[in-house]
Amino acid sequence: MMQHSSSVTQEPTNPFGFVSQVGSFVFNNSCSRVSKSNFTLDSYSNLLSNYLYFDCNVKKDSLNHKNKPKASPLLSLSISNKSASSFSRVLFQFNKAIRFHCEKIPLGFASVGVNCGESNGVREEGSVVENEGIPDNGVESEPPKKVLILMSDTGGGHRASAEAIRSAFNEEFGDKYQVFITDLWTEHTPWPFNQLPRSYNFLVKHGSLWRMTYYATAPRLVHQTNFAATSTFIAREVAKGLMKYQPDIIISVHPLMQHVPLRILRSKGLLKKIIFTTVITDLSTCHPTWFHKLVTRCYCPSEEVAKRALRAGLKPYQLKVYGLPVRPSFVKPVPPKVELRKELGMEEHLPAVLLMGGGEGMGPIEATARALGDALYDEIHGEPIGQVLVICGRNKKLFNRLTSVQWKIPVQVKGFVTKMEECMGACDCIITKAGPGTIAEAVIRGLPIILNDYIAGQEAGNVPYVIENGCGKFSKSPKKIANIVAQWFGPRQDELRIMSQNALRLARPDAVFKIVHDMHELVRQRNFEPQCCPA
């Protein structure tokens, strides 16, 4: 068994502290003075989308850096109440600060030096250039389309979805597409914005801080203002990052990857040339920043998410409900349970429960494993009624503690695994937190799910999603969870079987293939040549 070193999470500062404080100041000090009759929670979310715009007129000679485009954000609010004047004054001061930074920092592709001539395979700014010569048969081949997937390692689900999409492109279209994955915030923004993943991990570990951040930034007025302010500091670096890949398709699998890139594309008139799609990786509840009206396509994992997208202003033709993209290996058949259990060192004919806590091995795994060790042992007959497969991920300390325990039942402890489809295929049910990717994979394998935790905000809706569809239960108590499993492996086996059938009905194993084929169709319909540089 391979052991992996555990990760150490430090406590960084919040890179969006300044922006959040300004947004909170605007919201708290202004909206509280506006009467409910004129400025309600139902109306303020529409204000900024109607009155926030950027004057980004780009001239043809902007590439020579003589006339750099400037972003001039202007906010104007029409509220027929005396208290509106104080609200407008605060926003005026906020806009003045943003305008100052916009004048200092050029925006968009025009601010990036691009050489469209002969480059011998190398462009300025480290651009990715492929060999597009003539093959040996003398016939010029069409260069592959370039796909850029934008993600961030804030949780494991975004990277997993990005990898699944890349694998599907490779399997379905081979060398017709070149797929690149980039962590936009870490790799293409300046400090402190490039500390986003570390800040997220810190906030999630302090649940109340994350809950406050999630819901405080949900109103459109707040997050649009935050993005407007943030863009003035990161737009140039983000533009360089996009130009590095010269993409034909941009795919966002993260809620913070829509607004800034789309603003840059719009400022350069590239929205009709570059396909921009969003693949939402939250099953039910999702943050409003997932939705942007300028996307070419928004792929929703469920009808509930599609309804949210419509309420956010997207049009029906922009939406496709295909399911959550999971790795293509989950679509392929796996060997029978007996064979998989033998390969994993498990008992071949004993019911098995899979216990996991994500890539970092988070959650009450040890307490739950010990409770299962007691509940799945028949004291009367002196024999086990079930077995446990524990996935510790990169949590080396947890791995060492569990492997040192003298168990009364068969317990297999694994570190970080890459073939999760085989681990799930070897088991009869699963205990996990409410991560959308794990839920989507579990229902494909027909596993009843016991959810033992969730992240406030984006994962909260996954609990009723599982329960209401009849494919699982929820409990935070290790003892209650162990008793549920013991019942499923004993007198309530029929309930386990019914939940397994419900899970299979909920599964969408081909979602990732439908997504990439729809993107391929968008490329075919648009029929544009890869862009060297904007005019």
UniProtKB/Swiss-Prot annotation:
Its main location: plastid. Residues 1-113 form a transit peptide. InterPro entries: Diacylglyc_glucosyltr_N, Glyco_trans_28_C, Glycosyltransf_28_UgtP. GO terms for molecular function: 1,2-diacylglycerol 3-beta-galactosyltransferase activity. It is an enzyme of class 2 (transferase). It catalyses: a 1,2-diacyl-sn-glycerol + UDP-alpha-D-galactose = a 1,2-diacyl-3-O-(beta-D-galactosyl)-sn-glycerol + UDP + H(+). It is found in: Plastid, Chloroplast membrane. The gene is MGD A. It comes from Nicotiana tabacum (Common tobacco). Involved in the synthesis of the major structural component of photosynthetic membranes. One of its GO terms (cellular component) is chloroplast membrane. This is Probable monogalactosyldiacylglycerol synthase, chloroplastic. Its EC number is 2.4.1.46. PANTHER family: MONOGALACTOSYLDIACYLGLYCEROL SYNTHASE, MONOGALACTOSYLDIACYLGLYCEROL SYNTHASE 1, CHLOROPLASTIC. One of its GO terms (biological process) is glycolipid biosynthetic process. The keyword DNA damage does not apply. Keywords: Chloroplast, Glycosyltransferase, Membrane, Plastid, Transferase, Transit peptide.
